[in-house]
Amino acid sequence: MGLNHLTLVCSAIALLSIFVVSQAGVTSTHVRVSEPSEEMPLETFPPPACYNAPEQVHITQGDHAGRGMIISWVTPLNEDGSNVVTYWIANSDGSDNKSALATTSSYRYFNYTSGYLYHATIKGLETLYNYMSNPKGQAVLFAGDLSYADDHPNHDQRKWDSYGRFVEPSAAYQPWIWAAGNHEIDYAESIPHKVHLHFGTKSNELQLTSSYSPLTQLMDELKKVNRSETPWLIVLVHAPWYNSNNYHYMEGESMRVTFEPWFVENKVDIVFAGHVHAYERSERISNIQYNITDGMSTPVKDQNAPVYITIGDGGNIEGIANNFIDPQPSYSAFREASFGHAILEIKNRTHAHYTWHRNKEDEFIPEAVIADSIWLKNRYYLREEETS
């Protein structure tokens, strides 16, 4: 994928804001007005009316080199031709059509029977100039907690179908790369499945399973990243490692203690997390000299460390997390109890511009408001420079 301009939209989704500034950072006094959280009924996104029409179409990156794409969709029936994807070069006359066969599966879960699930991998793709210059964003990063099906009896799988239709207008046209959250953990009716954790970078996605040492997998995966081809190293987790909100405080600590030294050593640029339903951005800090068990140790600024961004604020049925710790810790640069989304524009191999947008809340605010922004400098190429 071209490096001249890459845009990532991150979500987990007052005209004048007043900020409280401390030695630590900024705590926005803007708090989203608490309103009843109403879940959309299943009928809001019904199945398509056409016979055996594909639905819930979504794409995600399909290889480590950025030249593959996985196309996924669902149909009610498994008929001849339902498992074939036809594709061609953009702006061509269609005479060079190619096709890819998809794997097919279905499943039962309590009293639910799925449609037929298809996954086709297209390989050997080239990046076109009109795609590289697309201002709409080339990928969406989602840090977990998607449909909240697990909040319903028997983890109502119809919610996944409804969610798939809901996001299709975006997910069918730009790759979504997501981490699995706690709301994605489903269990068999009697025996729990193995827990999965997902890590992603710009050019790949790593799935960690309990059958293989996550640390060993992470070490192996980080060694594969060629920073001359993939200058920016971005990681997705679900539970944040640096979180100054009383909600889910220090729930990611055991993971941080295990993995953080490797993130610093390999100069990871950004770590995005969800889980906490608010927004927070850290300084470049590390705590690799400590093994925190009581929360009393203090992280230090470290220009080899990532910026940690909690962006679990994309909207949900559980409400906003508006209980920040006071005083604001020194590692916290900016935090706000609102819903929003972020845009990361990778300008080149050394610089990226990051903005966090507070979602529109009422009719008097015409669009999302940029409440936080920062220029980021690549840790691999500009490792000794300050980031702001």
From Swiss-Prot:
Subunit structure, interactors included: Homodimer.
Residues reported in the UniProt entry to bind Zn(2+): 145, 182, 238, 275
Listed under GO cellular component are: extracellular region
For this protein, the Enzyme Commission number is 3.1.3.2
Please list the residues that bind substrate.
182, 275-277
Query: How far does the signal peptide extend, from start to end residue?
Result: 1-24
Question: Know the name of this protein?
Answer: Purple acid phosphatase 19
Cofactors, names only: Fe cation; Zn(2+)
Can you tell me which residues bind Fe cation?
145, 148, 277
Source organism per UniProt: Arabidopsis thaliana (Mouse-ear cress)
Q: Known InterPro entries for this protein? A: Calcineurin-like_PHP_ApaH, Metallo-depent_PP-like, MPP_PAP, PPA-like, Purple_acid_Pase-like_N, Purple_acid_Pase_N, Purple_acid_PPase_C_dom
Task: Give the gene name.
Answer: PAP19
For this protein, the record's Gene3D superfamilies field holds: 3.60.21.10, Purple acid phosphatase-like, N-terminal
Protein family per UniProt: Belongs to the metallophosphoesterase superfamily. Purple acid phosphatase family.
Sites of glycosylation? 97, 111, 226, 291, 348
**What does the record note about the cofactor?**
Binds 1 Fe cation per subunit.
Gene Ontology molecular function:
acid phosphatase activity; metal ion binding
Is the keyword Lipid biosynthesis assigned to this protein? no
Summary of the tissues where the protein is detected = Specifically expressed in flowers.
Query: Which key words are in the record?
Result: Glycoprotein, Hydrolase, Iron, Metal-binding, Secreted, Signal, Zinc
Spell out the reaction equation it catalyses: a phosphate monoester + H2O = an alcohol + phosphate
